[in-house]
């Protein structure tokens, strides 16, 4: 099963939209603030929030930047 990591920061409206979307679909995910954990932001090449990373093992299968429901749907349904 894929591991989903959502990079977000406080007071970010698109970040809240991504969270609401994933919660509505009952999808489990981890939330990371790239300012609190910059080493993970560097590891996953996160430059802006929200960024959703879908991992298969250690391999990045999908990277979604911003709130893009169609891309999220594709990424989490694989």
What is each stretch, according to the model?
Residues 45-53:
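Structural micro-motif
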Residues 29:
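Hydrophobic anchor at the start of a short beta-strand
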Residues 56-78:
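Non-catalytic, surface beta->alpha helical segment in thiol-disulfide oxidoreductase systems
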Residues 36-42:
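Acidic, metal-coordinating helix/loop segments flanking the phosphotransfer/catalytic sites
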Residues 1-25:
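Local sequence-structure signature of Cys/Sec-based thiol-disulfide redox active-site neighborhoods
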